[in-house]
Structures are given as C-alpha cells and as structure tokens.
Design a protein with these regions (language model features):
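Beta-loop-alpha module in the N-terminal Rossmann-like domain of NAD(P)-dependent dehydrogenases
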Residues: 49-112
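C-terminal glycine/acidic-rich active-site capping loop/insertion
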Residues: 211-240, 244, 248-251, 278-354
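C-terminal helix-rich "cap/oligomerization" subdomain common to oxidoreductases
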Residues: 1-3, 69-71, 284, 324-325, ...
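Hydrophobic residues in well-ordered beta-strands that form the structural core
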Residues: 95, 120-122, 151, 283
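N-terminal Rossmann-like dinucleotide-binding module
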Residues: 1-49
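Rossmann-fold dehydrogenase core element
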Residues: 108-126, 145-149
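Predominantly a Rossmann-like dinucleotide-binding segment in NAD(P)-dependent oxidoreductases
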Residues: 126-236, 291, 377
C-alpha cells in the first residue's frame, strides 16, 4: 500500500485535531471523516471549514471498513476508551498526549497495542523539529560527551487571566495534572529522547496561581478569549498553573525544568540545554531552525537547519531547503510521515522511529511520580 492510498479518521476537531487533518493532507492521506464532541457541533464546524464529513461516534468511525488509521485528538479523559475501541476494530492508531490519565490505563493500552501488531504512536511532535533530531544524533555520537546537566522550560501565557478557560482546566476531563501533563509532558519526553536517558527520580513543586476562574457556561476553544459581555460562572481551581521540577536521569545526569501556562508574553516557548563533558547543546522553539553548540576552548556555533549539514536521521525530516523556514505544523507532517511509512507496510517496524505507546506510558509514569512528589514534598522514584 502507498501512503496516498491510506484512509484516516480524526477524533476531536479542536485546535490540535485540525492540525492533524492539515498534516495528513500534506502527506496525501485521505482524511475520510471526523468525530466531534457532539454530531451537531461537529457538523457546524465542518460547514464553516474544509474538514471532511462527520461520523456520529468513535464506534461508527472505527467500524468503517474503508478506514485504516484513526487519530485521537479528543480531551484527555476520553483517550483510554477511544483507543480501546480503535484497537478492537483492528485500526492503526495515533493518540495525542497524554496517552491516558494514569499509568494503569497506559500500561493496558500499551499491552493491547503491542499484542495487536498494529501501528501505535503518541503525538510527541516537538521531537520532530529537525534541530531536535540533530541534537539527539550529536549526543548519540558522543560529540558532547556524557550528558551531565539537562535544564530548560516550557512556558505559555494563554491561561494567565482569571477569565481564561478551556476543558483542560476541568480535572474530570483533563486529569489532576494540567500544565505538567499538557505541555510539561512534551519537555520530559523531548529531553529523554535527546539525551538517551530516562528520568528516574523527581522532586516537584506545583502551583495553582489563579485559584478562582470565571468562565462561560459552554465550552471555549483552546487559546480563545472570552467576550466582555459573556455571563461568567466562578469556579475554584485545583490543577497546576505552573511547576518547578528537579530531575535525575539514568547515568547520573541532573536536570531542572519550569513549566507555566501563566507567563505573560510567552505564547509557546520551549527551551532546553543539554550540557555534556565536552560541549553543550541548546534550542529554543522561538528560533526553531537553530541549534546552539557551546564550547569551552573555541567559538560557539549556531547550526542552522540544512539537510546537507544534518545527520541522516535529522535531514530526512526536512521538507524544504535550508533558509526556507519550517515550524510547528511541519513537526506533525514529519512525525506522521514516519508513522504512515509503517502503516503502508502493514505494521510497526522492529524499532519504530516515532514515539509509540511505550513512550506514552513512560511519560505518564514520570508525571505520576511528579504528582506524588508534590503531594508528599519529597524525592520520588519513577515506578517502572
């Protein structure tokens, strides 16, 4: 089967679901239909956009014999049951992070996926900026020496105001962790991917900095703002707006990260530095084309995205020549291109080049340890 013969469906048509549809179309995948939070809301959105037709339910989508792959981009609480439905129907599946709300469920989904022989992936798309694959290749080749210190941040501002609202603020839909699970999970996955080291212990301090929020009675799109004339309801908040986390990685490397969705002016700012015994690597999502390489005894370097200068595993992600900027939407295309190469061959490669349910499970093990560490205010071991 060729990639342009594959048919897909997408569950969830908010901000991220639409990003999935757009990336799949760039690959030539036929997106047959979508499922929304309700058929009525989905039809209204389809009528005002270029989205495909609406299916009544995940079961109906999974039951369509024409569909080969289903993407789950719905609110977090729905992932477990929806992924099970898709796997039971014999469809390949791509799920947004977090894979599920707890490690028991992620372990179950991982086992089901592995025993099914179906392609399974978790959408840790930030790995797929080419600079981040280049960083991974440099670390793996020993160019920076053994990683010693891994630091950084993931900051946003879209939940700064007490009138900012989204389903992610509701624990019954998003889980008890919010900033850590929503965006921190990307950073945790990314730094383990680059360093080749899993996180083994954590010490976390989580903060609810906006204790009471005012919101409309109905749903609010991700990153949307509330109109001044809207009648608002007050609700107490319990999930984390921000976090500071100390980390210990395999092999002895130490780490520290701050995570925030209430940092004014930071729209979607991801940063890391991996300091090794020879040199250091650094990257910032605001300048995604450039990888910083720091040296002690000679001039520092900025390695810009260029397929002729990058390692093979990084250059194959690049769709345009150097100097033609690629960004956030391109990470989905790059990730899905690797997933769909396996779909086209009928099943997962022996060593997939994309994050699988095993990676999704491992990140939830880490975030579970972060939640426990904050509750108990102590160092906590990741339970593998």
């Amino acid at each position: 089967m060729r990639v342009n013969e594959i048919k897909a469906g997408v569950v969830g048509i908010g901000f991220i679901g639409v990003a999935h549809v757009e990336a799949l179309r760039r690959l030539g995948v036929d997106v047959v239909g979508v499922v929304g939070s309700s058929p009525e809301r989905a039809r209204a959105k389809v009528e005002s956009s270029s989205l495909p037709g609406v299916y009544e339910s995940v079961g109906a989508l999974a039951g369509d014999p024409e569909i080969d792959v289903i993407h789950i981009a719905s609110p977090n609480h729905a992932h477990t049951d929806q992924v099970r439905t898709v796997l039971e129907a014999g469809k390949h599946v791509v799920c947004e992070k977090p894979l599920a709300l707890n490690a028991d469920d992620t372990a179950d989904l991982m086992r089901r996926a592995e025993s099914s022989g179906l392609v399974n992936a978790v959408c840790f798309n930030i790995r797929f900026y080419p600079a981040n694959h280049q960083a991974m290749a440099l670390v793996a080749a020993g160019e920076i020496g053994e990683p010693r210190l891994i630091t950084g941040s993931y900051h946003q501002d879209w939940l700064l105001l007490d009138t900012d609202w989204n389903w992610r603020l509701q624990p019954e839909e998003a889980g008890q962790l919010r900033a850590v699970a929503d965006i921190g999970s990307h950073w945790l996955d990314l730094t383990s991917f680059i360093s080749g080291k899993r996180i083994v212990e954590v010490m976390a301090d989580l903060h609810t900095l906006v204790p009471v929020r005012r919101h409309p009675a109905g749903p609010v799109e991700t990153f949307a703002t509330v109109d001044d004339t809207t009648e608002l309801i007050e609700e107490e908040m319990t999930s984390d707006d921000a976090a500071g986390i100390l980390l210990r990685y395999e092999g002895g490397a130490r780490g520290a990260v701050t995570i925030s969705q209430v940092s004014a002016g930071q729209k979607n700012s991801v940063r890391y530095e991996v300091a090794g015994g020879k040199s250091a690597l650094g990257w910032h999502s605001a300048e995604p084309e450039d990888l910083f390489i720091g040296h002690r005894g000679r001039a520092n370097e900025i390695l810009s995205r260029d397929p002729g200068l990058y390692a093979p595993e990084a250059s194959k992600l690049i769709a345009y020549p150097g100097g033609h900027v690629e960004g956030f939407p391109d990470t989905f295309r790059a990730l899905f291109s690797q997933v769909y190469a396996d779909v086209a061959q009928g099943g997962p490669s022996e060593t997939p080049t994309y994050p699988t349910f095993a990676d999704g499970h491992d990140v939830v093990l880490v975030t579970d340890a972060i939640a426990q560490s904050d509750r108990e205010q102590r160092w906590t071991t990741v339970q593998r």
